């Protein structure tokens, strides 16, 4: 029940932050977090054009991000750091082109901002002198930590982007939306194929399942909601 209340508070805070800016004092924020019905409004179109022609270092030189205040308000980072529930947050190391995972003890506002940093909307988030972007470019979500962590053999996957759409996109914005879905789904598809390959080898008796370095037989489950995610 506490989790439901916290999630409700998060979305209400995001709604308030977006609502304050709907008429233009932060068009990028509105375009990112406002509902789908705004996609055909002049505000949305101007925000899209701005993001395609200017970088966030130009249109947001002071690096303002309303999400920082939202996270500060909603998330109890001290409780998260001390929690027995293992958390893994993925980011993309810009200079190295590699994924970096942050665990409980390392989590902070900056880490969460980095994990959600779309580079055409926000400046890279620096942590310990290194710039980071959204982790979804390389791990969306990262599955491999769960293979080595103290977790059950059942893994439940909740996809955020639809894997399949029934129509061929023809409008420019719809094409870009579908391209982003494919790009962000690609790391997950690659990991799922690797998981399936390893599981096949285990079933064939070709991989060791004993000892600390043994492979585990995992059961993958997914809540598929492509029809809802496509709306």
Listing of model-derived features with the role each one plays in the protein:
Residues 68-77, 109, 113-124, 135-143:
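Active-site glycine-rich loop that binds ribose-phosphate moieties when present
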Residues 2-70, 94, 103-107, 130, ...:
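Non-catalytic peripheral regions of patatin-like phospholipases
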Residues 83-85:
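Short, basic and Ser/Thr-rich N-terminal targeting/leader segments
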Residues 77-80, 148:
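Secondary-structure boundary motif
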Residues 90, 98-102:
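Alpha-helical segment proximal to the catalytic Tyr-Lys
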Residues 89, 112-116, 179:
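Short alpha-helical scaffolding segments that buttress acidic/His motifs in well-ordered protein cores
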Residues 122-127, 211:
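Short acidic-hydrophobic surface loop/beta-edge motif
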